[in-house]
Amino acid sequence: MKNQFLEITDPIHDFIRLNSTEQKIIDTSVFQRLRRIKQLSGAHLTYPGAQHTRFEHSLGVMHIAGMAGTSLASKKQMPVTDIDDIRLAALLHDIGHGPFSHLFEEVLQKKKHITHEQIGKEIILKSEIGDIISKTTDKKKINRLAVGEGKKQFENEIISGALSADMMDYLLRDGYFTGAEHAKIDHNRITNSFEIYKNKLALQSSALVNFETMMISRFQMFKAVYFHKTVRAGEVMLLEAMSLADDHLGLSEMNAKEYVEQTDDTILEKLTSLPETNSELKAAKKIAIDYQNRKLFKCVFEKTISGKKSFGKNTLKQFRQDIAKKSKLAESQVFIDTTTTHSMPLAPSKKESNSIILIKKEGSKITPQIIPISEIPLVSTMSGKMNILRAYTQQKNRNKVEMAAKSILGEL
């Protein structure tokens, strides 16, 4: 049967073309659920336009991954037949995300140490999505590739890492919908400049400036959007409410079938409808209702911790206890947030990317060069971690907690 194509209009990529297998996958209820999971959790309370979801982001990642595959295939560096597999894996790279994306994952990790990648693998193998994939290719191969465990390293790097389709789409898309002007990325130039060297993804040296611009854009987006103090206030509230209500709602005990029925709205509805049978549930319900009505926690202390220093859970717990004691408040009224990310994207191995392979072409002569990211002038200034320590509380406790937090955290 002739493959039927469908074109979807997209504000980032103009048109995204889907083949029949891709169409069948996005039409499943499991995939359609991503329409109801916001890409940026609670950022819409600060940036009203940030209503975009994991659904359209997944389509965008598939599109850019296809561009990367087409570029490499045109240079005879990979078979044309592998492009569809890369696109499928990219389409499904976020299929395991739960409500409120990474926030729900934090709740799962506290008790079960489960990641959205692990859940995604189970969904691909055991749901109708796996059955659809099996009609055209190996679902186990797609499953591995979607979570960065494919046999060909360069294919993993197309989906996640310093040159990934995932990062290019989320920066472009998040910048567009938040209205932030930091996401300046020429993804066409970058993907057209892809090469393969020793089974790893490389970049033509002439596109180094585009890589630098992308890394700077990423750094700025973290500072201006992802780690914005008010964005984080909403996320701290969601995380606290879900953590307090976990035992009652069984959020971390859900099986795969229950998990894929959950969305941002279903979880928020459960939180705002909690019975007030104990202090934890009462607090969780109040926080959720305040979040829903945008009565957000107030940031009373903020400090950027430079370099590679970070704080463990026990240290953060001690900070919370000390500030509460000094403020003469219950510990439940003080919230410590530390936003930490590597300044460079993580490779598929989950380790920080520390080098990039540049390919210099002069006629028929090809010269590869492995450049430590620390030696790229514009990028090296951002090496280490972005680590921001903040203290939050309710409006009524603002002055007390501010004084205590400055006293305890000010000299760090």
State the predicted function of each range.
Residues 86-91:
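Short alpha-helical catalytic segment bearing the HExxH-like zincin motif
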